[in-house]
Swiss-Prot record:
Stored PANTHER family: PHOSPHOGLYCERATE KINASE (PTHR11406), PHOSPHOGLYCERATE KINASE 1, CHLOROPLASTIC-RELATED (PTHR11406:SF23)
InterPro entries: Phosphoglycerate_kinase, Phosphoglycerate_kinase_N, Phosphoglycerate_kinase_sf
Family: Belongs to the phosphoglycerate kinase family.
HAMAP family: Phosphoglyc_kinase
A Pfam match: PGK
Pathway: Carbohydrate degradation; glycolysis; pyruvate from D-glyceraldehyde 3-phosphate: step 2/5
Biological classification of the source: Bacteria, Pseudomonadati, Pseudomonadota, Gammaproteobacteria, Enterobacterales
Organism for this UniProt entry: Buchnera aphidicola subsp. Acyrthosiphon pisum (strain APS) (Acyrthosiphon pisum symbiotic bacterium)
Protein name as annotated: Phosphoglycerate kinase
Binding site for substrate: D21, L22, N23, R36, H59, L60, G61, R62, R114, R147
């Protein structure tokens, strides 16, 4: 992989367009978690230190493309930046696509990229407009690196210089460290509701990790190979595929589970073995024996890859499995990497972000990188380097 890095370029007094990932949860104009903003700051701060003219763009949520929707405006991010960079002039508008004049060390935040018609289908005219704003394009949104859109991919065809920001490089380096030459033993914890969405990830990780621990609806599909699991969430169409994986690799499934009769917040949990689950019961978390076994595996590991909760952690009585796994990873001296939307929510819930070696900002991009897919944004950076170096 040959790409330019922002750290290698002279960006002083240059117009720098940074594609950040500022897709944070916002309710009633209040930012609920600033994790992605904090991850984006080092690249922005470096550009300011180098006296670049800094333009920032990002998407937020899923508005109807081409239309302004207040709920999805980046205005709360603008307010956040004003406090963070209180000695810096910061501009915010939806009209910057026609050009903006900045002095070195100033910032312009563009409005939500998805308010621009053509963003999602990688429109060439829009991509060209983005490229006209800058001398150098910095791709720093790992969380959107798997999307072939104008602001993440199309711009690379027109801009003279495209490079990777600090966050994108750190994401790639951390994933390579876990996947290429992991310290052993390596354990991968894969939770979530569907085997179908993570089958390729499981298949790839099974060939790399010494042990795979499955949780959530994914584990239920593996349990359904041998047991009747009541009304638990699982995928009947993937039971055969799950069996092929289990028979070939070291995949750990729960030996006991917390079950309930109703999927609701205050439902009482009963611990049962998989051969004792009734028709009107559903699995919603690991049981104590499973937790004990899994803690032992994690404690002995030197590399830990974690994607997804192992139970319905939003319900207090079905939180223990996810909580104990999260805290065991946090207390481990192993190299740990965590990624995926719900995983970040768990990390926030138990306040362990400073105890994980690397927390990926990517969801889909995180999974596709693990699968071995070439992410469109990285492909764009490679092509830009190759074509503009001739």
């Amino acid at each position: 992989m040959t790409i330019r890095k922002m750290t290698e370029l002279n960006i002083t007094e240059k117009r720098i367009l940074i594609r950040s990932d500022l897709n944070v949860p916002i309710e009633n104009g209040i930012i609920q978690s600033d994790a992605r903003i904090l991850a984006a700051l080092p690249t922005i701060e470096l550009a300011l230190q180098k006296k670049a003219k800094v333009i920032i763009m990002s998407h937020l949520g899923r508005p109807k493309e081409g239309y302004y929707t207040k709920k999805y405006s980046l205005f709360p991010i603008f307010e956040y930046f004003k406090k963070k960079f209180n000695n810096t002039k910061i501009y915010f508008s939806n009209n910057f696509l026609d050009g903006i004049k900045l002095n070195p060390g100033e910032i312009a935040l563009l409005e939500n990229t998805r308010f621009n018609k053509g963003e999602l289908n990688n429109d060439e005219q829009l991509s060209k407009k983005y490229s006209d704003l800058c001398d150098i394009f910095v791709m720093d949104a790992f969380g959107s690196a798997h999307r072939m859109q104008s602001s993440t991919y199309g711009i690379g065809k027109f801009v003279k210089i495209a490079c990777a920001g600090l966050l994108l490089i750190s994401e790639i380096d951390a994933l390579k460290k876990a996947l290429k030459k992991p310290k052993r033993p390596m354990v991968a914890i894969v939770g979530g509701s569907k085997v179908s969405t993570k089958f390729n990830v499981l298949n790839k990780l099974s060939k790399i990790a010494d042990t795979i621990i499955v949780g959530g609806g994914i584990a239920n599909t593996f349990l359904a190979i041998d047991y009747k699991i009541g009304k638990s969430l699982y995928e009947p169409d993937f039971v055969f595929e799950a069996k092929k994986l289990r028979d070939k690799y070291n995949i750990i499934v729960p030996i006991d589970s917390r079950v309930g009769k109703n999927f609701c917040k205050n439902e009482q949990a009963i611990i049962k073995s998989p051969d004792n689950i009734k028709e009107d019961e559903e699995i919603m978390d690991f049981g104590d024996e499973s937790i004990k076994k899994i803690i032992s595996i994690i404690t002995q590991s030197q590399t830990i890859m974690w994607n997804g909760p192992v139970g319905v952690f939003e319900f207090p009585n079905f939180r223990k499995g996810t909580e104990m796994i999260a805290k065991t990873i946090a207390n481990s001296n192993a190299f740990s990497i965590a990624g995926g939307g719900d995983t970040l929510s768990v990390i926030d819930m138990f306040n362990i972000k400073n105890n994980i070696s690397y927390i990926s900002t990517g969801g889909g991009a995180f999974l596709e990188f693990i699968e071995g897919k070439k992410l469109p944004a990285i492909q764009m950076l490679e092509e830009n380097f190759k074509n503009k170096s001739k």
